[in-house]
């Protein structure tokens, strides 16, 4: 199960890295989906509540699908100015390894590594957004990462937050238009 947790943690990190590097709806949705799959795999492998893990999976997938409906079309990957976010993606994973440290030998520790990496990178992205759709995608990813640090109720709350943020409109309304 440790290998499954490790695959989940890496997949979650790759997903949140995509959220961090994307500015358009497809990139955000695919990143959110990848993060969801990774965190769900890690949660199941670490022995978390099966119902909580299922709720996390459902909420993340619904949030990702809802993110496809509005915002800037396309992928929006690696736009000018995104190099610091790419560097941050690598550094955050290394920082999460140091932070989790000695508990990496067990599936729970590996799952925690993925959740910490997701939460840190999503938080960094949330603080640097320029568009509302990026903020909503990063917020949903942050909710999933923080929820994955807990058990049943935290996983369900994270799923609800991801769906709620996915349901919000990403287009800014302009007064007078």
Model-found features: residue ranges?
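Alpha-helical transmembrane segments of multi-pass membrane proteins predominantly involved
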Residues: 1-177
């Amino acid at each position: 199960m440790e290998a499954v947790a490790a695959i989940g943690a890496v997949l979650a990190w790759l997903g949140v890295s995509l959220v961090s590097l994307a500015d358009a709806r497809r990139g955000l949705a695919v990143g959110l989906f990848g993060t969801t799959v990774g965190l769900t795999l890690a949660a199941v492998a670490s022995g978390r509540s099966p119902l909580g893990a299922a709720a996390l999976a459902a909420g993340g997938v619904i949030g990702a699908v809802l993110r496809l409906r509005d915002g800037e079309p396309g992928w929006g990957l690696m736009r000018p100015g995104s190099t610091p976010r790419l560097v941050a993606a690598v550094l955050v994973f290394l920082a999460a390894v140091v932070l989790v440290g000695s508990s990496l030998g067990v599936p729970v520790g590996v799952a925690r590594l993925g959740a910490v990496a997701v939460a840190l990178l999503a938080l960094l992205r949330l603080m640097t957004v320029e568009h509302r759709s990026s903020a909503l995608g990063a917020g949903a990813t942050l909710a999933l990462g923080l929820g994955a640090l807990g058990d049943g109720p935290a996983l369900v709350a994270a799923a609800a937050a991801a769906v709620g943020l996915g349901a919000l409109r990403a287009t800014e309304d302009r007064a007078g238009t």
